UniProtKB/Swiss-Prot annotation:
Its main location: membrane. Residues 43-71, 176-203 are extracellular. This is Gap junction alpha-8 protein. The keyword Disulfide bond applies. Changing P88Q: In CTRCT1; severely decreased gap junction channel activity; does not localize to the cell membrane. Pfam families: Connexin (PF00029), Connexin50 (PF03509). GO terms for biological process: cell-cell signaling; gap junction-mediated intercellular transport; lens development in camera-type eye. It comes from Homo sapiens (Human). Eye lens. A hemichannel or connexon is composed of a hexamer of connexins. A functional gap junction is formed by the apposition of two hemichannels. Forms heteromeric channels with GJA3. InterPro entries: Connexin, Connexin50, Connexin_CCC, Connexin_CS, Connexin_N, Connexin_N_sf.
């Protein structure tokens, strides 16, 4: 058993990096092959050539007949079978150990980088904890990537070796050993009868070893099926990812989104009507349309640079609006509607209204219907028209023109306060009448 200790120590590493079925296969290999082959097979086939007897005295005939009956010893054949079947497992163990060590180095390197980034220096206690956790973590692994492919390949090679040795055993010996073997090879003079020792015991042992080989073969096939179903299940759980070039072309409709949502109990105004914005959906991988060309800078207006505040009139030319007296009929809407195309007439009316207001302010002391010369008359000395005619020209009736108090029309040198009192007395007298 000391000769098998080295192989046993190496195969123990396989047990740490295998599935459940792989561990069962290793158990069958250790107990039912190596152990039985080392303890019982040597005693059964110990006297194999010495007990092979032939009924001839011809020198060399017995050795030639034994070589024809047993080209290779059963024990040596089974040893070769164990070595060949274990070789893929040894190769897988070497790759698994290398993979685990590389993972440990990568994790330790990442931990050091994180420690340097965080600015924390790990002491000896932390390093020992990392080493202990790394040694424990070697037994925990996941069959994925290259490690999974290597594991599947080593199972396939084990299966092929098992099938090859079973077929070779059948062609060499068959599945049983007969007690009588007839030999006619040279230098035997004729057909020679040879006898095999313990044929029944050897047949039972051969059948047992073939059954163990069949169990190992079944475990290999079962493990391949288990890994295949596991891969199919994980592939079905993943979302299907299609490359960009294989996306089918579909006509996508636009999505209409209302810019203003109607509130409950309110009615939208004319300018707040719902406008639908269309956002066309584009396919992945389609060429985007080129953006609109930028407008040249010469289309923009130059801003007028203003200096101090006194120069604001140059940048902003604004005029205050002027107001004219309007009759009651026009205020109430009784006047004739203005035509749409009468824009120049409106400007002339505004100028005349301004001129009338200035004249009325100057003629406060003049009685109604009296003609007074104004500074704005022509050089030829034309007389000013009465106020009633001017008002009629502006579209106002003469009856509705405001009349002034007679006391205020006469020239009076009294101050304004006395004049206002006199006008109020006159108005009260008019009311009493």
């Amino acid at each position: 058993m000391g000769d098998w200790s080295f192989l046993g120590n190496i195969l123990e590493e396989v047990n740490e990096h295998s599935t459940v079925i792989g561990r069962v296969w290793l158990t069958v290999l250790f107990i039912f092959r190596i152990l039985i082959l080392g303890t019982a097979a040597e005693f059964v086939w110990g006297d194999e050539q010495s007990d092979f007897v032939c009924n001839t005295q011809q020198p060399g005939c017995e050795n030639v007949c034994y070589d024809e009956a047993f080209p290779i010893s059963h024990i040596r054949l089974w040893v070769l079978q164990i070595i060949f079947v274990s070789t893929p497992s040894l190769m897988y163990v070497g790759h698994a150990v290398h993979y685990v060590r590389m993972e440990e180095k990568r994790k330790s390197r990442e931990a050091e980088e994180l420690g340097q980034q965080a600015g924390t220096n790990g002491g000896p206690d932390q390093g020992s904890v990392k080493k202990s956790s790394g040694s424990k973590g070697t037994k925990k692994f996941r069959l994925e990537g290259t490690l999974l492919r290597t594991y599947i390949c080593h199972i396939i090679f084990k299966t092929l070796f098992e099938v090859g040795f079973i077929v070779g055993h059948y062609f060499l010996y068959g599945f049983r050993i007969l007690p009588l073997y007839r030999c006619s090879r040279w230098p035997c003079p004729n057909v020679v009868d040879c006898f095999v020792s313990r044929p029944t015991e050897k047949t039972i042992f051969i059948l047992f070893m073939l059954s163990v080989a069949s169990v190992s073969l079944f475990l290999n096939v079962m493990e391949l099926g288990h890994l295949g179903l596991k891969g199919i299940r994980s592939a079905l759980k993943r979302p299907v990812e299609q490359p960009l070039g294989e996306i089918p072309e579909k006509s996508l409709h636009s999505i209409a989104v209302s810019s203003i949502q109607k509130a409950k109990g309110y009615q939208l105004l004319e300018e707040e009507k719902i406008v639908s914005h269309y956002f066309p959906l584009t396919e992945v991988g389609m060429v985007e349309t080129s953006p609109l060309p930028a407008k040249p800078f010469n289309q923009f207006e130059e801003k007028i640079s203003t200096g101090p505040l006194g120069d604001l009139s140059r940048g902003y030319q604004e005029t205050l609006p002027s107001y004219a007296q309007v009759g009651a009929q026009e205020v109430e809407g009784e006047g004739p509607p203005a035509e749409e195309g009468a824009e120049p007439e409106v400007g002339e009316k505004k100028e005349e209204a301004e001129r009338l207001t200035t004249e009325e302010q100057e003629k406060v002391a003049v009685p109604e219907g009296e003609k007074v010369e104004t500074p704005g008359v022509d050089k030829e000395g034309e007389k000013e028209e009465p106020q009633s005619e001017k008002v009629s020209k502006q579209g106002l009736p003469a009856e509705k023109t405001p009349s002034l108090c007679p006391e205020l029309t006469t020239d009076d040198a009294r101050p304004l306060s006395r004049l206002s009192k006199a006008s109020s007395r006159a108005r009260s007298d008019d009311l009493t009448v």
